[in-house]
């Protein structure tokens, strides 16, 4: 669907057929929130919602892009002029990725792009990284380069940090680049070593949107990162990944109580992510559910990134799932989605419970879908 829409938008805008189509998935993080930029551990899986870029070469040094999902908004940028903010927010991601590829000598001399996707915006499912990885892969292929997935992820993260203004970690870009069908990935965000963790065949991943959109290009998200860096400096460690709970509790005197809570979330969330990978590999959904519940409480009370609507949605899901699995907020916070991991034979009952028991602040029902774990970036 997205491939056909992207190709059609390309033909309308540029009057020719695209040379290639590239897709990159969104993702859902099962556990490990705000640990990536602390050099910690995360456990996401790529999902069957994606962004597709239809791409073709140009020889005029310009990058022209059109977004099928924004009423055909377009952008025109001189690739040799250095990054400059665009009129449209989505185009900053496109320009940012192109700029870092140009600096790395991996971009073509000019390109035409048409973009279509179905990763819900502002949902915590990483529509931004999906776009970045699809654009980066498409431009590199047009330029005759096959980028290693890890490097592609690092370049895309750099684009978002430097040109969009969100000081995100590497998780979203890594899972979009390296996702494996049927698996979650335990990612060590310091070494970038990934462990493929099979999802139990009898488990379903349910995603429900709270109806509250978030935006992470600054503000509260970046504040959390600064607080984590303050805590790391207090304890004289390179990152909070290097801190254990005993040291945290013994050495917290003199640290701002808010910063101490932020650090406690990261330290305990790292431990939960590692334990969750083992529970998932063993097919132990009840243990996974306990870890997800603890993660949500930590995000609510220590990291303070949930909102009342998300807390309500998670409570509805947890009540419907019971001890058979779990649910938690997923994504950077301040709105977005909840994720549930449940026995497949309970998926319909959980979806029905959400439909009957939750309403967004505007009175609308939650958007709910059962997703499957897919592979990372590829030709569409």
Please report, for each region that a protein language model flagged, where it lies by residue.
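C-terminal nucleotide
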Residues: 1-27, 31, 52-87, 186-327, ...
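Gly/Ser-rich oxyanion-binding loop with an adjacent helix/lid
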Residues: 1-22, 27-32, 38-41, 79-81, ...
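Short Gly/aromatic-enriched secondary-structure transition segments
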Residues: 39-46, 224-225
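Short, charge-rich binding segments
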Residues: 44-46, 54-57, 88, 105
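Short, amphipathic alpha-helical segments that act as regulatory/interfacial helices
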Residues: 47, 98, 102, 229-232
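FabD-like malonyl-/acyl-CoA
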Residues: 129-130, 337-342
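Glycine-rich phosphate-binding loop
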Residues: 334
């Amino acid at each position: 669907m997205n491939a056909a829409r992207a190709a059609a938008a390309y033909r309308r805008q540029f009057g020719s057929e695209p040379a290639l189509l590239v897709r990159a998935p969104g993702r859902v993080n099962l556990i490990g929130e705000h640990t990536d930029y602390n050099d910690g551990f995360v456990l996401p899986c790529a999902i069957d919602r994606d962004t597709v870029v239809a791409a073709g070469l140009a020889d005029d040094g310009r990058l022209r892009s059109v977004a099928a999902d924004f009423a055909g908004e377009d952008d025109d940028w001189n690739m040799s002029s250095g990054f400059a903010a665009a009129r449209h927010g989505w185009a900053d991601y496109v320009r940012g990725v192109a700029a870092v590829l140009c600096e790395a000598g991996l971009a073509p001399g000019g390109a035409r792009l048409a973009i279509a996707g179905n990763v819900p915006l502002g949902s915590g499912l990483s529509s931004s990284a999906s776009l970045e990885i699809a654009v980066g892969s498409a431009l590199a292929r047009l330029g005759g380069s096959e980028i290693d997935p890890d490097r592609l992820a690092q370049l895309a993260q750099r684009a978002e940090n430097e040109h969009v203004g969100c000081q995100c970690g590497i998780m979203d870009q890594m899972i979009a680049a390296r996702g494996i069908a049927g698996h979650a990935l335990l990612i060590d965000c310091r070494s970038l070593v990934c462990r493929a963790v099979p999802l139990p065949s009898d488990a379903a991943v349910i995603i429900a949107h709270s109806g509250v959109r978030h935006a992470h290009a600054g503000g509260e998200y970046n504040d959390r990162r600064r607080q984590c860096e303050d805590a790391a400096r207090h304890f004289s460690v390179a990152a909070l990944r290097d801190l254990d709970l005993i040291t945290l509790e013994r050495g917290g005197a003199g640290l701002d109580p808010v910063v101490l809570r932020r650090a406690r979330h990261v330290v305990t969330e790292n431990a939960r992510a590692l334990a969750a990978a083992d529970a998932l590999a063993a097919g132990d959904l009840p243990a996974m559910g306990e870890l997800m519940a603890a993660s949500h409480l930590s995000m609510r009370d220590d990291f303070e990134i949930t909102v009342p609507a998300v807390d309500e949605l998670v409570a509805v899901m947890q009540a419907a799932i019971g001890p058979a699995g779990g649910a938690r907020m997923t994504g950077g916070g301040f709105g977005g989605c909840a994720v549930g991991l449940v026995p497949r034979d309970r998926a319909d009952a959980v979806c029905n419970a959400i439909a009957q028991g939750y309403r967004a602040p505007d009175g609308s029902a939650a958007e709910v879908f059962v997703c499957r774990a897919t592979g990372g970036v590829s030709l569409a």
